[in-house]
Design a protein with these regions (language model features):
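Fe(II)/2-oxoglutarate oxygenase catalytic core
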Residues: 1-213, 221-246
Length: 246
């Protein structure tokens, strides 16, 4: 979907090595809804999949209060050339243990791997990207239109697994019910060429819902998307990516 070499990138690749920092003492994933009560919903064919109630409202609330204690940094207003304008506060850490927990100690692994869907996921899914990103958007903050890149990663183990990311994972911890207004993630279906008489397709808007997990295809077939401006309250998101064997 993404026209090649056109448009901004997310600017979140591990291009600039981060100094090693102590991994946070992440709280346990409890309470959770039983796996049997959860399902993947393909809300936009081949592009966007959601899991409503992936985390409970209580777990989201506990996480927001825990994450508030982390040293978040405000992203520079002026992005590097080619990167999207992204105004939010974030915390980024390479934490393979947390990524593995988020994968295996929740319904994610079962839901994603129970049906062999190599075509959908872009290969054999082996886990989540250890590069964990926490975003906090306060009033006035947003993430401008961009495409998410696919990256090569190595999942630790004996032996390590060589993998590449194929889908973005966004786990929303806040919503209008928690006082966060705005901040929807909006996807823009492929815009036809200017001269075409076809109408421009409507954007696909994902409203914030605390505990909703959203997966969207990235890399060469990523849809143009943005995080709309937050107009009140705070939007909190946990970001990782699905990884397939390479
Ligand atoms: O915060 C959002 O709604 C979008 C985040 C995003 O697009 C990204 O992490 O690449
Ligand atoms: Fe993105």
């Amino acid at each position: 979907m993404a026209p090649k070499k056109k448009g901004k990138s997310e600017g979140l690749t591990a291009a600039s090595p981060q100094p090693a920092k102590a991994t946070p003492n992440w709280p346990a994933f409890t309470p959770l809804v039983p796996k049997s009560d959860l399902a993947l919903e393909e809300v936009l064919q081949g592009q966007i999949v959601t899991i409503p109630n992936f985390w409970t409202a209580t777990l989201c609330k506990n996480y927001v209060s825990f994450l508030s204690s982390l040293p978040l940094t405000t992203t520079p207003g002026k992005p590097k050339k080619g990167d999207a304008v992204r105004v939010n506060d974030r915390f980024q850490i390479d934490d393979p243990v947390f990524a593995e927990r988020l994968w295996s100690q929740t319904a994610l692994k079962s839901l994603v791997t129970e049906a062999q869907r190599k075509e959908l996921w872009g290969g054999e899914v082996v886990g989540l990207n250890p590069n964990i990103r926490i975003y906090r958007y306060s009033k006035g903050q947003f993430f401008d239109q961009h495409y998410d890149d696919s990256n090569n990663v190595t999942l630790p183990g004996a032996p390590p697994t060589l993998a590449r990311t194929t889908w973005t994972l966004l786990l929303y911890l806040t919503s209008p019910a928690t006082g966060c207004i705005g901040g929807e993630t909006v996807f823009y279906p492929y815009s036809p060429r200017k001269k075409s008489k076809d109408p421009t397709p409507e954007p696909f808007v994902v409203d914030l819902e605390a505990g909703l997990a959203l997966l969207h295809r990235h890399g060469a077939d990523c849809m143009l998307h943005e995080g709309r401006e937050v107009t009140d309250g705070e939007k909190w998101v946990i970001r990782s990516d699905l990884c397939v064997k390479r």
